Amino acid sequence: MTMNAQAIINSIEAEFLKEDLPTIHVGDTIKVGVKIVEGGKERIQPYEGTVIAKRNGGISETITVRKIFQGVGVERVFLLHSPRVASIKVLRRGKVRRAKLYYLRDRVGKATRIKQRFDRAL
């Protein structure tokens, strides 16, 4: 049996994929639990925001989450299958018609709100 290089890579990566991830869509408001080591202690820091971009790609699947902290927009890119991501919880579904919501960077205040979507389960 001969396998090409991509099939070999996919079979090795499949062992490290997380199965317990919820379905995440662009526009959703999510809470990500990030493992942080401070001193000798390890704790989980919650990061809550709106998903403005998603990249599919097996083990290198990423989401970009944006939130406003003390009046400043903060964006963070998370590798979904990373061991640093302890948990992901979808808080509300957003109704959007774009794959990438980069236009939210230019908007301020109430203009950044996204309509809630009720036809998808949490």
From Swiss-Prot:
- PROSITE patterns xref list: RIBOSOMAL_L19 (PS01015)
Q: Keywords, A to Z?
A: Ribonucleoprotein, Ribosomal protein
**Would you say which domain of life the source belongs to?**
Bacteria
Q: Which residues form a coiled coil?
A: none
State any GO CC term.
Answer: cytosolic large ribosomal subunit
Which biological process annotations from GO are given for this protein?
A: translation
One Pfam family this chain carries? Ribosomal_L19
Q: Which GO terms describe its molecular function?
A: structural constituent of ribosome
Which family does the entry's similarity section mention? Belongs to the bacterial ribosomal protein bL19 family.
**Primary role:** This protein is located at the 30S-50S ribosomal subunit interface and may play a role in the structure and function of the aminoacyl-tRNA binding site.
In Swiss-Prot or TrEMBL terms, this protein is called Large ribosomal subunit protein bL19
Lineage of source species: Bacteria, Bacillati, Cyanobacteriota, Cyanophyceae, Synechococcales
What gene does the UniProt entry assign to this protein? rplS
